Amino acid sequence: MKVIGVIPARYASVRFPGKPLAPLSGRPMILHVLAAARAARLLTRVMVATDDARIAEVVRESGGEALLTSAEAASGTDRLAEAAVRVPADVYVNLQGGEPLMAAENVDLVVETLLASPAREIATLALSGIGETAARDPNVVKVAVAADGRALYFSRAAIPFPRSGVPAFRKHLGLYAYRADALRRLAALPPSPLEKIESLEQLRWLEAGWSIWVGEAVSDSIGVDTPEDLAKAEEIFESRGDRPKQVAGTGPEGACTRNSPRPAPATVQRLGKTAEKEVIR
């Protein structure tokens, strides 16, 4: 089975322009995400899908693979679906480009959650036991889950409301795994009323009758959406004393290590009217 991890990366972020290339622990942030993704056991291939040649070039120089997608993609799922047209696979994993502290174990878990049954078409992860402060933060998305593991609802509000005084909040982590046909059909869905109210794309799928299966994450992750978030991530890297993770087969600046083979130049495909492949050198 071919399982491809795709990291959507947009340069023109409203809250943080140029976010994927922002320096973090001595390297562009997108390379930390790429390294974490490549540490996952169950991904057979990892690539960055971006509408910006600068991001593609940084990824290429590190030994990674980048796909140039259209600037019109409205969401990460749309960018993923666009990439899937050109890169066949059985399963696609949407890896958030703003998650430099993403755990490889969580990536494997979302794939395992999807593959637990051939009837499952979409899977994601949640973290149990978050406190009320996080639950009341509208930037932290919560999910209510049925006994069989299906998502009942996602919200920026604190759900479910602890009327009995015993909180049971679960934080949604923005990792998704999709079967190929499901991804194609999801991308064709129009925006839905609940999606517009909460500004949560996954509500579009629930409203259309899709089941989203939720696995239990092994650890939390910090999303970087603003320069302030980046500063927090930098503090975590410094406190852990981590050396920047390298893309497999490369050295600190994307160069090959002495004992590893030199990676071939990454192919950057422009997804548009032509089917030609470009190799950026």
Predicted features and spans:
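Conserved alpha/beta core of the MobA/IspD/sugar-nucleotide pyrophosphorylase nucleotidyltransferase superfamily
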Residues: 165-243
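A conserved hydrophobic position in a structured secondary element of the catalytic/binding core
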Residues: 50-51, 102, 178, 225
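Short phosphate-binding loop-to-helix
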Residues: 47, 53-112
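Short, high-confidence coil segments that cap the C-terminus of an alpha-helix
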Residues: 43, 89, 118-120, 210
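Conserved core of the sugar-phosphate nucleotidyltransferase
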Residues: 102-192
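N-terminal glycine-rich phosphate-binding loop and ensuing alpha1 helix
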Residues: 2-49
